[in-house]
Structures are given as C-alpha cells and as structure tokens.
C-alpha cells in the first residue's frame, strides 16, 4: 500500500489556517462556509436535537451572516476545537504540507507552538493533530468524518471529536 502523496503548496494549507483563525476569533460564519456538506448536515442535526426542533427547521443554515442560527450550530464545533487545541495556543499552530490520500481527500498536520514560518527539522517534526478536507463544489472543505477517521489511523487525537449533545 502506498502512502499519501505529499504536496508542498495546496489550498488545504490556507483553508486550515483560515479555519483555525475563524475558530479563535469566534467567527461562526467563516467557520460554517469552510465545512463540507456532510459536516454541515451533522451539525444541523445536532442543533436540532439540542434545540428540540425538527430537522426540517434546522436544515439550510446560511453562513453569509444573515442567519442567526449559525453561531448556535457551530458552537459545539468551536468548543471542541478550543478544548483540543487550547484557546491560548490556537493561533500558534503551524500547518504542514498537504497529504493527498485519495482523489478529493487530503489532510494537513498541525504542528504545535510553531512560531515563525520556517522549514522544520526532523527533530522538531512532532504533529499533534490533523485536519482533513474533501474537494466538493470546486473547493477544499473541512470534513468531520474524514478528520476522525484519519486521526484514528494516524494515532493522533481528533481535534473535532469533542462534540457532544
């Protein structure tokens, strides 16, 4: 079995950085538009269960800032990220090169306490988490299920796995 293909400049790197910054800033709209359709559906379902509303009423959350529900829907995801990565350290993670696992599936490794942009030596290379993306609608979007599966496969903790009802 072949390992993932390494890509040095890939849209998932910028997407991961933007998503982490949005989570740190509490920008629910930016977080929402960065998520895959499947992940959005999962969060809408969780929102429906928590709010006691029908799935039909919870579906179709818009991320453009006009939908008041987006902050409530993304709150469990943001809480999970802050708990796993640390609110005070969230802006300090480095994002490694993308790894292409399959057509339309890629992930990036997060390096804690990275500091300034630089090339990392073998001794410094200690990834703590990964974020997985799927390519849909011509964009690379963060995917909850792929992040969980690839994190488990890599023996890394799932930064999005702390979501609870």
Annotate each predicted stretch with a short phrase:
Residues 24, 39, 47-50, 59, ...:
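Generic low-complexity, intrinsically disordered sequence content enriched
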Residues 12-14, 24, 93, 103, ...:
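Short, surface-exposed loop/turn motifs at beta-strand boundaries within globular domains
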Residues 99-165:
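Low-complexity, intrinsically disordered terminal/linker segments enriched in charged
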Residues 1-5, 31, 63, 133, ...:
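Polar low-complexity intrinsically disordered regions
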Residues 1-33, 37-49:
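Short, low-complexity N-terminal intrinsically disordered segments enriched in polar/charged residues
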Residues 2-8, 43-122:
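Surface-exposed, charged secondary-structure patches
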């Amino acid at each position: 079995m072949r390992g993932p293909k390494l890509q040095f400049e890939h849209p998932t790197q910028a997407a991961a950085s933007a998503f982490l910054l949005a989570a740190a800033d509490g920008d629910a709209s930016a977080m929402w538009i960065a998520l895959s359709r499947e992940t959005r559906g999962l969060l809408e379902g969780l929102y429906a269960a928590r709010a006691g509303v029908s799935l039909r009423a919870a579906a179709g959350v818009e991320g453009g800032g006009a939908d008041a529900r987006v902050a409530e829907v993304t709150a469990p995801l943001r809480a999970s990220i802050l708990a796993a990565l640390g609110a005070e350290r969230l802006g300090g993670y480095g994002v490694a090169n993308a790894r292409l696992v399959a057509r339309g599936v890629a992930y990036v490794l997060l390096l804690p306490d990275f500091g300034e942009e630089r090339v990392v030596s073998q001794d410094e290379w200690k990834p703590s988490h990964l974020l997985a993306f799927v390519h849909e609608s011509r964009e690379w979007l963060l995917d909850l299920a792929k992040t969980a599966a690839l994190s488990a496969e890599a023996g890394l903790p799932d930064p999005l796995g702390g979501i609870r009802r």
